[in-house]
Amino acid sequence: MDMKKTLIALFAALMLPVATFADKYTGLWKEYDEAVKKDLPKSQINVLERIAASAAKEKSYGNLLKAEVRRINTLASISADSIPGAIRMFEAQAANAGNSDKALAAVYNCVLADVYEKVEWKSNTFPNAGQTAKDYARKALAHPEVLAAKNTGGYVPFVKEGTDSRIFNNDLLSVVGYTLKEYRRLNDYYNKTGNRT
């Protein structure tokens, strides 16, 4: 009986950090949502910076990316003048991730490709946005084998599971490829490797 109690206590102790992890982010995202409801952009940015700092330290990439993208959106809603600086910071983080985690760098590059594609027609601030978007898209898909081997679970809540996710074994390649509308490239890769279920 003592062995059973010991095992239960050990299991509970091992699960505690996971529960605390989830509760911390859930609490921070609720705090952020409250700041949004009250239209308090400075408070939103403060919470997002705390989420990003904690997530970077703990390698909770889904929370990190979600916080960083929301931060850029919040800064943009305050002042369009802050967009270039926020994007440059995001670019630096993408470059930094490229040195340590190719999958994380690919997601950063995918987001940057999407951002530059959307600003191309709206802004004189980014005169080469179209080409820059293509460059980031190319970087995002530079290592398809790494993305195909990486499950999207580590990128929640930034990435949400879709209805077709299981067809691609919930891999990151399908998310990046579909976001960038690289359907033919995905099809060619999956036909060659047989990664689809």
Residues covered by each model-derived region:
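General helical structural elements
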Residues: 8-9, 75
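Bacterial N-terminal signal peptides
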Residues: 9-17
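Positively charged n-region of N-terminal signal peptides that target proteins for export
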Residues: 1-6
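Extracytoplasmic/secretory-pathway proteins
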Residues: 24-197
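Boundary at the C-terminal end of the N-terminal hydrophobic targeting segment
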Residues: 20-22
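Charged, amphipathic alpha-helical interaction segments
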Residues: 17-18, 118
